[in-house]
Design a protein with these regions (language model features):
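Small-residue-rich hydrophobic transmembrane alpha-helices
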Residues: 50-110, 147-166, 260, 273-337, ...
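Residue-level signal for short hydrophobic patches within transmembrane helices
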Residues: 9, 13-32, 36, 59-66, ...
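Helix-terminus/linker motif at the lipid-water interface of multi-pass membrane proteins
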Residues: 28, 32-50, 120-127, 183-190, ...
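Small-residue hotspots at the loop-to-helix junctions and early N-terminal turns
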Residues: 45-58, 133-137, 196, 268-283, ...
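Transmembrane helical elements of multi-pass membrane transporters/channels
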Residues: 18-37, 139, 150, 173, ...
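Hydrophobic transmembrane alpha-helices of multi-pass small-molecule transporters
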Residues: 62-65, 177-182, 207-211, 283-286, ...
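Short alpha-helical transmembrane segments in multi-pass integral membrane proteins
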Residues: 1-20, 78-143, 187-243, 299-364, ...
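Short runs within selected transmembrane alpha-helices of multi-pass transporters and secretion channels
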Residues: 71, 140-158, 166-174, 195-208, ...
Length: 448
C-alpha cells in the first residue's frame, strides 16, 4: 500500500481549489453532454421532445438524488477514516459502499420504470409530450444501475482526495455520449429513445473505467469483488449520516416536481423554455456543488485528524469560492441570455420564455453558492441532520407554500419563478445563523 496523502496539511486554499477544479470540470463535462443531448433533441426531434426531456429531469433528480444523497454518508465516513489514516476502516467502508450501490442501483431501475407513467400524470404533463416523456424516462431508468455505481465509485475517490481520476472517466463518458447522440438521434433517427440509450451506454462506459481503476489500484481504497459486503457497524453509520441528505434531496426534488407541474400548466412552449433554462442552470449549480463537495471532503478529513481551526478556515475560503463563481456565472448568463437559450431551439417564443425565466434566477445565484458550500462543510463534520433541516425548511417547505399561494391567488409564470430566489435567501440566512451559533464545531473525533 502507498502512503496515504490527505488534505490535513498544506496551504488550505490550494488544497480546496486543486481538489475542486477536477470536480468542477467533471460536472461541467457532465452538464455539457446533457446540454448537447437537449440541443440535438430540440433541433432534430422537435420542441415537444425537448419539453419531454426537460420535464423528465425532475423525476430523474427525485430518484437518483436520493441514492446520490445517501452516498454522502459513505463519503463522510471514508474521508474521516482517511484523515485519521485508518486503512482498515477505509477498506471496509469502500466495500460496504459498493454493496449499497449495487443494491440501490437495481432497486432504482425497478422503481423508476414502474412509477414513470404515474409520476408524469401527477405532474400534469400535457398529452402532446406525455408519451415521449414515458419512453425517455423508462429507457433512462433501464440503465440507472450504471449511474448509481459510477457516482458511488466516484464518491469514494473524492472522499480520499483523488478527484482527478474521476474527471478523466467523466470526460470519456461525456465525449462518448455526444458521439452516441449524433449516431442514434441524427444518424439512425431513433429520436428520444436514441437520446436515452446514448446516456445509458455512456454511463456504462464510465462505470467500467472507474471500477477497473479501483480493482487495479494498490491504494487503501482498492476494490476486491469478493469482499463486497455490508459491514453492519459501518452500514448503520453510513445510513445515520447519509439518509438525512438522501431525504433532503428527495424532498427538495418533490418540491421541484411541484414547480415543474406548475410550469406544465402554462403549456408545452413554456415547458420547453424552462427545460432549456434548466440545462443552462447546470453550468452554475454543478460547479457550486463541486465546491460544496470539496468543502465536505476537506472538513471530513480534518475532523478525522482533529483539526478544528483548519475546518473553520476551510469553510470561509470555500464559501468565498462558491459565491464568487456564482456571481461571475450569473453576470455572464444574463448578458448572453438570448444567445444561450437560442442554441436549444429556433422557436422564438421558446427563446423568449427561456430568457424571461433566466432573469428571475441569475442575479441571485450568489445566495445559492453560499447556502450549498456552508451546507457542505456542515455535512463534512457529520452534522447532516442539521443541514437537512435548513434545506427542507427553505428549499422545500417554503417553496411549496409559495407555489400553493401563487397558483391560488396570483397565477403567473413570474410569481412561480420567484419561489426559487426567495427560498435561496431564506436558506442562506438560516445556514449562516446555524454556523454563527457555532455548535456544529463540537468535534466529532470519536472512533467511527
Amino acid at each position: 500500500m502507498k502512503k496515504m496523502k490527505t488534505m490535513t496539511e498544506g496551504v488550505i486554499w490550494k488544497e480546496i481549489l486543486f481538489f475542486a477544479i477536477p470536480l468542477i470540470l467533471g460536472n461541467l463535462f457532465q452538464q455539457l453532454y446533457n446540454t448537447v443531448d437537449s440541443i440535438i433533441v430540440g433541433n432534430y426531434v422537435g420542441s415537444n421532445a425537448l419539453a419531454a426531456v426537460g420535464s423528465s429531469g425532475a423525476i430523474i433528480n427525485l430518484l437518483i438524488g436520493f441514492c446520490i444523497g445517501a452516498s454522502t454518508g459513505a463519503g463522510v465516513i471514508i474521508s474521516q477514516f482517511y484523515g485519521a489514516k485508518n486503512a482498515e476502516g477505509v477498506r471496509k467502508a469502500v466495500h460496504t459502499t459498493m454493496a449499497i450501490a449495487l443494491a440501490a442501483g437495481v432497486l432504482l431501475t425497478v422503481i423508476g420504470i414502474a412509477v414513470t407513467p404515474v409520476m408524469l400524470r401527477l405532474m400534469g404533463t400535457p398529452d402532446e409530450v406525455f408519451e415521449q416523456s414515458v419512453v425517455y424516462l423508462q429507457v433512462y431508468f433501464a440503465g440507472s444501475l450504471f449511474s448509481v455505481v459510477y457516482n458511488m465509485s466516484a464518491g469514494i475517490l473524492n472522499a480520499v482526495g483523488n478527484s482527478r481520476r474521476s474527471l478523466v472517466y467523466l470526460m470519456i463518458a461525456a465525449i462518448s455520449n455526444i458521439f452516441l447522440d449524433l449516431i442514434m438521434v441524427v444518424g439512425l433517427k431513433l429520436g428520444i429513445v436514441g437520446a436515452a440509450l446514448a446516456t445509458d451506454i455512456s454511463q456504462l462506459i464510465s462505470c467500467i473505467f472507474i471500477w477497473g481503476f479501483l480493482i487495479r489500484s494498490e491504494e487503501v481504497y482498492k476494490l476486491k469483488i469478493r469482499e463486497i459486503r455490508c459491514y453492519d457497524h459501518l452500514l448503520s453509520k453510513i445510513i445515520r449520516i447519509g439518509i438525512p441528505t438522501g431525504i433532503q434531496n428527495i424532498v427538495i426534488s418533490l418540491s421541484n416536481l411541484i414547480v415543474q407541474a406548475s410550469v406544465n400548466s402554462f403549456g408545452a412552449t413554456v415547458m420547453a423554455g424552462f427545460a432549456a433554462y434548466i440545462k443552462i442552470d447546470g453550468f452554475n449549480i454543478l460547479p457550486v456543488l463541486s465546491i460544496s463537495m470539496a468543502a465536505t471532503t476537506f472538513a471530513g478529513q480534518n475532523i478525522g485528524a482533529g483539526k478544528a481551526d483548519r475546518v473553520r478556515k476551510g469553510m470561509y475560503i470555500s464559501t468565498a469560492m462558491g459565491a464568487g463563481y456564482s456571481v461571475i456565472t450569473g453576470i455572464v448568463l444574463l448578458i448572453f441570455a438570448p444567445q444561450v437559450i437560442g442554441v436549444f431551439t429556433t422557436n422564438h417564443k421558446v427563446v423568449e420564455y427561456g430568457v424571461y425565466i433566466m432573469k428571475y434566477f441569475c442575479p441571485f445565484y450568489w445566495m445559492l453558492g453560499i447556502l450549498h458550500v456552508l451546507g457542505g462543510t456542515i455535512r463534512g463534520t457529520g452534522k447532516t441532520m442539521q443541514a437537512m433541516i435548513v434545506f427542507l425548511v427553505s428549499l422545500c417547505g417554503f417553496r411549496v407554500m409559495w407555489i400553493a399561494g401563487t397558483m391560488a391567488w396570483a397565477k403567473s409564470l413570474g410569481h412561480v419563478m420567484m419561489c426559487y430566489p426567495t427560498s435561496w435567501l431564506l436558506g442562506m440566512l438560516l445556514m449562516i445563523l446555524y454556523v454563527w451559533k457555532g455548535k456544529w464545531m463540537i468535534l466529532r473525533t470519536e472512533k467511527i
